[in-house]
Structure formats: C-alpha cells, structure tokens
C-alpha cells in the first residue's frame, strides 16, 4: 500500500520513467483524473524536466506525435463517468508508453479489471472498502503492476516464505530496491505505508 491515490499515481509515473527506453520526456494525463492527482503529478514531475500533457484522451491523444513515457487514465472518471478505455490504452501502447489506470475498487466488482483492459499499472484508493472519509484522510492507496515490473516498484514488498519450523512466514522481499541498500539509486523515497488501513480494507473485502 501507499499513502493515497495521488501519491500512488505519482509513484507509478516514476516507475514508468525508470522503465522507459525511448528517451522521451512526455507524459499524458487525462483531464478526467482527480484535480488533486493531476496537481501532485505535476509537482513530482517538473523537477525532472518531464512535460505533462493534460487533456481529453479522445481529442488530444491522437494529436501527440511523439513517444510517451506513460499515459494516466481514470476508470471511472472523477465525475463518475464510465467509459471503455481499451482504445485509449491501445493508442498509448502504440506510442511506446505504459498505461496507468487509476481505478475505483468498488466499481471493479462489476467493471472489467485493469489487467483485462490491458493496463500496465493499477492504482487507487482503498477508502471505499470500510474506511471512514475522515475529513480527507488518512486513506490507504493500492498499487499493482505486472510481474515483469516488480523490481521497479516503489515502497516495501511483503513476501511469503517458510520459517525454520516449516511454517508460513511473512518477510520483506526485494529489499535491494530500497533506500537502506541502494541509497540515492532506490526506486522510491516512500518510507512508510498505510498498513493498518490496508489491512482494514482487505478484511472488509473478505467479509463482504
């Protein structure tokens, strides 16, 4: 888990930048994303010289001739509109970009999943699963990606292992990505997560 939806989206952009082989500096973000998410991505990308292209995917995306690092889409949009993003995802992939789908967990009980739609990364807030609004937080975010990208993920990853008694044990995995080993070359500076809230959301989902 990560701190909130906007932070998770910005970390996803960072993952895409690490994986990019085209040397482009352009990122597309749909204007149907939450305004706070757009602003936070702007704040995180500007110091790295990245160009953020914000617009309507149906009209604006086709006008972009260059390669993209990634495209950030909302599913559903911030106003609740539900549209099939498959064509947009295909367009971004044709421009050699990864696709980040900001998703609503509860809606995914009925809608196609990001994986089924062809997205590379799925992020969002787990607040809908049993967490009070709390005047804006705290809310845990979720972050999921393809197996092939796991070594570029931000934050800490908990893996399942076996202890010396042969019982299942949970431990930190892939720690060579983190600050205490890679220092300035770490995949992220995220040092914490909303673990308690993530557990509450998981328990809520299991119960229901």
Ranges and model annotations:
Residues 129-208:
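Active-site C-terminal subdomain of aminotransferase-like
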């Amino acid at each position: 888990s990560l701190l909130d939806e906007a932070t998770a989206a910005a970390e996803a952009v960072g993952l895409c930048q690490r994986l990019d082989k085209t040397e482009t500096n352009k990122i597309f973000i749909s204007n149907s994303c939450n305004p706070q998410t757009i602003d936070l991505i702007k704040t995180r990308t500007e110091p790295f010289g990245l160009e953020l292209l914000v617009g309507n995917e149906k009209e604006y995306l086709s006008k972009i001739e260059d390669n993209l690092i990634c495209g950030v889409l909302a599913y559903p949009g911030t106003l609740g509109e539900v549209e099939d993003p498959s064509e947009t995802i295909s367009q971004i992939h044709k421009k050699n970009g990864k696709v980040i789908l900001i998703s609503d967990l509860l809606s995914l009980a009925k809608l196609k999943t990001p994986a089924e739609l062809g997205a590379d990364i799925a992020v969002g807030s787990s607040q809908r699963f049993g967490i009070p609004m709390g005047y804006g937080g705290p809310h845990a975010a979720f972050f999921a990606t393809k197996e092939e990208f796991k070594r570029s993920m931000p934050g800490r990853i908990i893996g399942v292992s076996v202890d010396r008694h042969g019982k299942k044990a949970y431990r930190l995995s892939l720690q060579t990505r983190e600050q205490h080993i890679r220092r300035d070359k770490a995949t992220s500076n995220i040092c914490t997560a909303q673990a308690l809230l993530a557990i509450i959301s998981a328990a809520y989902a299991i119960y229901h």
